[in-house]
Amino acid sequence: MAAFSLIFVPNAEAATCSPKVAAPFLSTTISGNQNDEIIGISSTKKIWIVAGNVVGDFLGTTPLNPLGGVDSLVSAFDSSGVNVWSLRVGTSEDDVATAIAVDSKEQIWIAGLAQSEKNPTAVTTPESATSTVQTQSSQTSTVQTFNPDSVTAQTVKPVRKDLKFITVAQVDKNGLLINRFANATNNSGYVTAIIPGSTGIFLIGIEITKSGGERSFVQSLSSAGEFGSKFYFGKSATTLTSGVLNKDKTLTLVGNSAETLANKSVAGKVDGIILNVSPSDGKILKIVRSNGVGATRSWKSAAGNLTVGGTSKTKSLNEGVISQFSTTGSVLWSKRYAGASAAINNSAVVAVLTTQSNSLLKSKAGDVVVYQFDKKGDPKLGGRIPLSTEIVGLRSQSGLGTCVATKASDGSFVLTQLPF
């Protein structure tokens, strides 16, 4: 039996700078099943929004009964750890979520995969309300024309070949399902990230090629449910994992590639890549490749101030890396942490998962160190989350602080709220 442990920390012990600050924490545990998972986190102005996948009954004494084998779940929590509402979306078949984002209008977007294009059923549990079942009968079954500081995507591998439809659910801030759109895909793949725009969203994803490799795509989706053309990047060895919408309406996309892109060939074993892309035609306007001899590098997160986070791996060294770039592609500053298996960021906060003791982070194996950084990348205030095996997501929100979603060593999922 898995558990979702929600740990909200008003103040955290400083892990990367002094003075130390300590305070009690509040903890709430929500029962789940063995295969339940959290795939990402975002927020509105007042609440944290968590997306995941569930099987069987959920939420203990207030069950959201299963709709199919696997269903998508969206759940909201306030800063005290209270579950404000939960929404379960699915069909009689399997439906899984792969990415989440919240736009400037506080509408929640959840991308995923489904076995069919049929209309979903929604089971909702608002705070202090009885569970009800609602069918979105006003929706069409399919659409014919087929963060800024949120890091939320978790990949689903291996991709099941029977999940043939990419789906996007649109939910309001009170947990009401507004729309659900579906688009058939010819190749196995999934959405890795959602970038909110002014008139809809951009889907960033991958497709599995016949050779078993990965190529990436960007595709627009209007608020009316119209899917735009897919623009592809790479042929069989390019993976895009995150991105942001820039002030000039271009997209910054990050990930990794082991093939030539925009006439720039791979220099290491696998290069970390930063692409500046025109969303109207998919043209690569700029490309920055981060590489090293024999190194496998990958960027996992990006922020609007051109700060990126990821990893670098060689035969002898694994590192977590956080860097900020200029608009011309030069490195303004970079922080490297030996013995780290993951590093993600937003525009002001970093989360690093360590697999061994690290003197710079003052951490030990299994710690997720979270810190707020200054304009030079140096830590200002930090905290640590022990006994962790994975960083699922990172979100900062004015008025709420920072929330980190992690997977613990016992298999549970933990949300930790910090005061910066």
Identify what each model region corresponds to.
Residues 1-7:
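Bacterial N-terminal signal peptides
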